Amino acid sequence: MKIGIVTGIPGVGKSTVLAKVKEILDNQGINNKIINYGDFMLATALKLGYAKDRDEMRKLSVEKQKKLQIDAAKGIAEEARAGGEGYLFIDTHAVIRTPSGYLPGLPSYVITEINPSVIFLLEADPKIILSRQKRDTTRNRNDYSDESVILETINFARYAATASAVLAGSTVKVIVNVEGDPSIAANEIIRSMK
């Protein structure tokens, strides 16, 4: 499967846009799969007793997060190899804000295992992201609860995605998630993968 990694800060709308990507490709009869990187990491974290949920997982030591990243990359690469023709999209983050600094979400040991065609940076105005975060009561994102922190994280994500693309030989594409119409970003992602 051709792989696209869709990154973005928590609250930017990755899951919503990727659901729209899936809907569009399904309607076109194109084989596709959406994988959430955090789901793979969380399954291992739960099994090892590292964390009880995603928000707790973000606060783990860098060493533990690296182990979880490696295990997830191997599992996702295997799914891509077994998937046949079509598209595999990975919902993840280019950087993770931790108590000890920004942890690259796609370091060399992850990006070379997955080997994507495109790394997408899904972005939106920090005010819009903050508003979306406040509406999502299912998550605890108080570590991203300030516009300046959101902007800083977006900038670090751009740097990290570019560095990862160099290692994988993939392209990087910034896509704006327009408020109220995720199909605009979804169609742009699909066009970039063809």
From Swiss-Prot:
Entry keyword set: ATP-binding, Cytoplasm, Kinase, Nucleotide-binding, Transferase
EC number of the protein: 2.7.4.3
GO molecular function, one term: adenylate kinase activity
Subcellular location per the Swiss-Prot or TrEMBL entry: Cytoplasm
InterPro entries (alphabetical): Adenylate_kinase_AdkA (IPR023477), P-loop_NTPase (IPR027417)
GO CC terms, sorted: cytoplasm
Provenance organism: Sulfolobus acidocaldarius (strain ATCC 33909 / DSM 639 / JCM 8929 / NBRC 15157 / NCIMB 11770)
Enzymatic reactions: AMP + ATP = 2 ADP
Subunit record text: Homotrimer.
Keyword Kinase set for record: yes
Enzyme class: transferase
Binding of ATP, residues: G8, I9, P10, G11, V12, G13, K14, S15, T16
Name of the molecule in the record: Adenylate kinase
Record family assignment: Belongs to the archaeal adenylate kinase family.
Primary localization class, coarse: cytoplasm
Pfam families tied to this protein: AAA_17
Family matches, as HAMAP family: Adenylate_kinase_AdkA
Alphabetized NCBIfam families for the sequence: PRK04040.1 (NF003122)
